[in-house]
Amino acid sequence: MAGRSMQAARCPTDELSLSNCAVVSEKDYQSGQHVIVRTSPNHKYIFTLRTHPSVVPGSVAFSLPQRKWAGLSIGQEIEVALYSFDKAKQCIGTMTIEIDFLQKKNIDSNPYDTDKMAAEFIQQFNNQAFSVGQQLVFSFNDKLFGLLVKDIEAMDPSILKGEPASGKRQKIEVGLVVGNSQVAFEKAENSSLNLIGKAKTKENRQSIINPDWNFEKMGIGGLDKEFSDIFRRAFASRVFPPEIVEQMGCKHVKGILLYGPPGCGKTLLARQIGKMLNAREPKVVNGPEILNKYVGESEANIRKLFADAEEEQRRLGANSGLHIIIFDEIDAICKQRGSMAGSTGVHDTVVNQLLSKIDGVEQLNNILVIGMTNRPDLIDEALLRPGRLEVKMEIGLPDEKGRLQILHIHTARMRGHQLLSADVDIKELAVETKNFSGAELEGLVRAAQSTAMNRHIKASTKVEVDMEKAESLQVTRGDFLASLENDIKPAFGTNQEDYASYIMNGIIKWGDPVTRVLDDGELLVQQTKNSDRTPLVSVLLEGPPHSGKTALAAKIAEESNFPFIKICSPDKMIGFSETAKCQAMKKIFDDAYKSQLSCVVVDDIERLLDYVPIGPRFSNLVLQALLVLLKKAPPQGRKLLIIGTTSRKDVLQEMEMLNAFSTTIHVPNIATGEQLLEALELLGNFKDKERTTIAQQVKGKKVWIGIKKLLMLIEMSLQMDPEYRVRKFLALLREEGASPLDFD
């Protein structure tokens, strides 16, 4: 049918504006017909018609979105002709529509179900023409939305013939909505509309994970397992598209607590998580910075941290970006409520504010709070429940593989510039640096570098660098070993000075009893290392005073080669109150729990307990603390050997402490003349002739003297002239009551 010239007019009613139809007089066309409107030779638009009595014959009424789309002005001459659809090729299979609120003043954050929207759309616009780029108004739930047709795919022709789907779908510019057309809604860019349901497009989202990161570039070593656990718990759900997360009813993890000894990489890990993610820069806050001297300001500082996340959640809903807030030393502001003295309760209100912001009445789903502390026991328990800081990750001392990674990272630049000598074996250093934290390993590398640099400084009146030699500067294996020996000692390691003083005279194996003690000690060390059933092994060395119990305990500890060895000795607690003693003992054991293999020597237990026979008197508080610590098993995967020493087995028996030890080993005094002579021979202080004289007096006789006391008597007699030494020694032996005999 040939076209006719008509005039564009304004749509007569608001209701007809929402119909997406062009409105004509019933004298011109019938309702339901489709027309092609030409505004110029190259511009044509297809509309579905409705009739209304108020429209003047010879004119076509268009709504504002239609006039905007077609570029029409009121009164403009247009050419109108009937248009018929080819039902085999132009039925709409799938149509993608961009949607936003029509007016900005009507914006809200309520979720809109796209499945219901799609059903309403098909009902309102069934059998109507749609073109790519077309604009229209859509009414749903008493709200007006502006729509823009983005994409149209024709229905599979096989379905129209009643055959199985062939999978062929063709993109078309113009199509007809039918009852089984599919509509997918896509949120307009920067829109705050919150769409839910399945009838929405999968949004092109930027991946949350930065594509070009790796552990070595991040400078993190030895934390592979911890990092993968954090990723699984905190980020896996954020990698998936929001629609899948929504269908699962899944809520993202909002908080992580990293805890562990100082220098093990908590702050480093949190800092690098921000770089790993394609999120905005994390807000890093030191705990004490939150506190303010003015009333209410501390709480306001907490609110400011969350303000950006709240505003974006209101605007973008589920598509809000991730906001990371990092609290360093979180124990400064999140102590147990009610634990602080004073009437102000500032700390309590700060904790309350933080609790309500992370998981309160208005829930935020676009935040990740990372807290760090080396005192997790101080933190309020409400902060650690699921929904708040629910992922609790211990960042402990690195194992050998971890130390290898850390040393590799810290020597990478030297290796790249050929400043690391070929004789440096990183694997050897990783083995030697047991119980070193990441910070201590970095310090070791720094110390080795300074040792190497020091070689090239001229020793003259002025400090000068020998530039000729400096060109050939290299850090050698010797530099690392020297730094290991002299400069850097691990905080949770073995301080040799600790136990070296106890065995400065060596171990004198004067007889089978000493050998048996050392052999049994070695068995207990092997049991601690190898047994999975007994992670806690404790042994009590008991015997008379001066029999060498402490030296044997220190020797067993040294021979164990455990990475952590500590001696809990009364000489380090002189003047301590009972509470201070308990705290000091608890700290030693807590430090031991942080190491994979640990040995604690509890020396002179009756002195630790302040025991005196007159009264009798002892500290019950220290006794109970020690009993608990002796029986407490170390954490999963950690092993602990406890060696106790006492001269008063009978007292510990009455205090019911003997049962707290796995086993008891008796350390006797020297009891026979033969054992005494063996000890003298091993010590080598007396000449053969002198020893023969002593042998004549003691051989076959009973004696009773501790090895420590024997050493004292020998050293005292050696101060005499050579001809009087033996006589003096025998006299001292008699005076000490070591033998009932009268020596000549």
UniProtKB/Swiss-Prot annotation:
Belongs to the AAA ATPase family. ATP binds at residues 505-510, 545-552. It holds the Pfam family CDC48_2. Required for vesicle-mediated transport. Catalyzes the fusion of transport vesicles within the Golgi cisternae. Is also required for transport from the endoplasmic reticulum to the Golgi stack. Seems to function as a fusion protein required for the delivery of cargo proteins to all compartments of the Golgi stack independent of vesicle origin. Interaction with AMPAR subunit GRIA2 leads to influence GRIA2 membrane cycling. GO terms for cellular component: cytosol; Golgi stack; midbody; plasma membrane. The gene is NSF. Its EC number is 3.6.4.6. Binds 1 Mg(2+) ion per subunit. The modification Phosphoserine is found at residues 207, 569. It comes from the Eukaryota. The modification N6-acetyllysine is found at residue 105. Phosphorylation at Ser-569 interferes with homohexamerization. One of its GO terms (molecular function) is SNARE binding. Its main location: cytoplasm. It is found in: Cytoplasm. Its cofactor is Mg(2+). CDD domains: RecA-like_NSF-SEC18_r1-like (cd19504). It comes from Cricetulus griseus (Chinese hamster). GO terms for biological process: Golgi to plasma membrane protein transport; intra-Golgi vesicle-mediated transport; intracellular protein transport; positive regulation of protein catabolic process; positive regulation of receptor recycling; potassium ion transport; SNARE complex disassembly. Homohexamer. Interacts with GABARAP and GABARAPL2. Interacts with GRIA2. Interacts with PLK2, leading to disrupt the interaction with GRIA2. Interacts with MUSK; may regulate MUSK endocytosis and activity. Interacts with CDK16. It catalyses: ATP + H2O = ADP + phosphate + H(+). The modification Phosphotyrosine is found at residue 259. SMART domains: AAA, CDC48_2, CDC48_N. This is Vesicle-fusing ATPase.
